[in-house]
Swiss-Prot record:
Oligomer and partners: Binds IGF2 more than IGF1.
Name of the featured protein: Insulin-like growth factor-binding protein 2
Record function comment: Inhibits IGF-mediated growth and developmental rates. IGF-binding proteins prolong the half-life of the IGFs and have been shown to either inhibit or stimulate the growth promoting effects of the IGFs on cell culture. They alter the interaction of IGFs with their cell surface receptors.
Domain IGFBP N-terminal: 38-120
Disulfide bonds: 42-70, 45-72, 53-73, 61-76, 84-97, 91-117, 212-246, 257-268, 270-291
InterPro entries linked to this entry: Growth_fac_rcpt_cys_sf, IGFBP-2, IGFBP-like, IGFBP_1-6_chordata, Insulin_GF-bd_Cys-rich_CS, Thyroglobulin_1, Thyroglobulin_1_sf
Gene that this sequence comes from: IGFBP2
Keywords, comma-separated and alphabetical: Disulfide bond, Growth factor binding, Growth regulation, Secreted, Signal
A GO cellular component annotation in the UniProt record: extracellular space
Length: 311
């Protein structure tokens, strides 16, 4: 993924856990209560890592926060209207990082540091914290986590004090479940013709957990039991996982895509909304395969086959 002006060394690798959260946000929101919370924790801030923080890492500023990702050194929090993103310091208390309203790909805008720190329009909806500002960086317990996670509600990123860091002995922190409307619009955008199929899709909705939700459950269960390496270890193996893109009814969105890697868009393909099977004849490309065109033809073929069987 693009690094938005941040070096590709340790700082970039340290942010991998948050990139994973960005990718998982739609999945977590759709998983519902069927699974336990998916948990992620950063490696401990050792004495050596703390000693490596230079005095310049404590500049005079209104609020100190931890470095992006799993960093241990204190940095100045970004203030209101300042630029922010995945690889930048967190926004100050009470602020969140939002992409530009006109951004075509909000998560990508945040990865590239093109967000802006702003106050949430509705603090009740997003759960903005009313707790005191973030700590000054003195407490570096073993279980400090990457607090600045990205979700896909238009690419919002939590502010500095939206969560308290977990203290020694507390090994887990649940990933916040929030609405994921924008990501679903981006991933499920297949043109007007697709929306004409919504009624027929609803009428054929399976009862209980749908195939898409079941596949999603399996992926989340696998991730929740993974032993994630620390920030020095690559997490490329996570990109081999396909996280299914389910719609609000639990059906597969016509367009399914792999995650972007090293700034290159992942491949996208078209599937049947009920069973998730690849639609024959539809392309697999790094872009929009215009699945609604192929689904229309696929649906007509199914109806024709059903009519023949009924005769």
């Amino acid at each position: 993924m693009a690094l938005g002006g941040v070096g590709r060394g340790g700082a970039a690798r340290a942010a991998w856990p948050r990139l994973l959260l960005a990718a998982l946000a739609p999945a977590l929101a759709l998983a519902g209560p069927a699974l336990p919370e998916v948990l992620f924790r950063c490696p401990p801030c050792t004495a050596e890592r703390l000693a490596a923080c230079s005095p310049a890492a404590r500049p005079p500023c209104p609020e100190l926060v931890r470095e992006p990702g799993c960093g241990c050194c204190p940095v100045c929090a970004r203030l209101e209207d300042e630029a922010c993103g995945v690889y930048t310091p967190r926004c100050a208390a009470g602020l969140r990082c939002y992409p530009d309203p006109g951004a075509e790909l909000p998560p990508q805008a945040l990865v590239q540091g093109q967000g802006t720190c702003a106050r949430p329009p509705d603090t009740d909806e997003y759960g903005a914290s009313t707790e005191p500002p973030a700590d000054n960086g003195d407490d570096r317990s073993e279980s400090i986590l990457a607090e600045n996670h990205v979700d896909s509600t238009g690419g919002m990123m939590s502010g500095a004090s939206s969560r308290k860091p977990l203290k020694t002995g507390m090994k887990e922190m649940p990933v916040m479940r929030e609405k994921v409307n924008e990501q679903q619009r981006q991933m499920g955008k297949v043109g007007k013709a697709h929306h004409n199929h919504e009624d027929s899709k609803k009428s054929r909705m399976p009862t209980g957990r749908t195939p898409c939700q079941q596949e999603l459950d399996q992926v989340l269960e696998r991730i929740s039991t993974m032993r994630l390496p620390d920030e020095r270890g690559p997490l490329e193996h996570l990109y081999s996982l396909h996280i299914p893109n389910c719609d609000k009814h639990g059906l597969y969105n016509l367009k399914q895509c792999k995650m972007s890697v090293n700034g290159q868009r992942g491949e996208c393909w078209c599937v049947d909304p009920i069973h998730g099977k690849v639609i024959q004849g539809a392309p697999t490309i790094r872009g929009d395969p215009e699945c609604h065109l192929f689904y229309t033809a696929h649906e007509q073929e199914d109806r024709g086959a059903h009519a023949l069987r009924s005769q």
